[in-house]
């Protein structure tokens, strides 16, 4: 049984599919470049000997990402337009903190490693918080602009392309970490 698709959604389907596919593919690539499982622990161990600090990476990220969703979900349902909210939160609160991590590492890693570490955790928390606030609205938006029968292929392709780009990204990260001097190698 095929579900009827709203004419407006059908008219804009190619655009919405392509733009969101590119966005998710590059987010997946970006997250592989700064992997919480490999790159972030390596960075933290260059700033401190504390194993607890390494363990805080997934803890801070998870709490900062999942907890806001509990409160943002109701707000997401009540918004008439999701895109402006998602774009603002995504740009300012989800993505900008990662740029600020780079600057923090560049400026403070050598002389003030504890400050660099604290700023790293603050910005990781801020980025995850931004993602957590935006995620319910983003999924609601995707639910409106992509028909049910296109969502599986959308998520499969976007994650697949992002992961394939991440393989190339892993090579670039490996070369960068090896050939660029610390702390510029992590700040790049």
Describe the role of every protein-language-model region.
Residues 2-76, 83-105, 156, 162:
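Helix-loop boundary and gating motifs at the non-cytosolic
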Residues 25, 90-134:
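Hydrophobic core of transmembrane alpha-helices in multi-pass small-molecule transporters
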């Amino acid at each position: 049984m095929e579900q009827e698709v709203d004419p407006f959604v059908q008219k804009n389907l190619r655009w919405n599919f392509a733009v969101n596919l590119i966005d998710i593919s590059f987010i997946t690539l970006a997250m592989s470049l700064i992997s919480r499982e490999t790159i972030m622990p390596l960075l933290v161990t260059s700033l401190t000997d504390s194993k607890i600090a390494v363990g805080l990476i997934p803890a801070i990220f998870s709490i900062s990402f999942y907890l806001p969703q509990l409160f943002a979900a109701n707000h997401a349902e009540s918004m008439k337009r999701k895109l402006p909210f998602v774009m603002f939160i995504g740009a300012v609160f989800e993505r900008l903190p990662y740029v600020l991590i780079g600057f923090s590492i560049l400026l403070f890693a050598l002389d003030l490693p504890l400050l660099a570490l604290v700023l790293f955790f603050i910005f990781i928390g801020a980025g995850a918080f931004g993602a957590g606030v935006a995620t319910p609205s983003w999924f609601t938006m995707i639910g409106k602009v992509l028909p049910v029968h296109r969502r599986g292929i959308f998520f499969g392709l976007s994650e697949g392309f992002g992961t394939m780009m991440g393989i190339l990204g892993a090579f670039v990260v490996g070369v960068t970490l090896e050939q660029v001097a610390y702390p510029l190698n992590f700040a790049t």
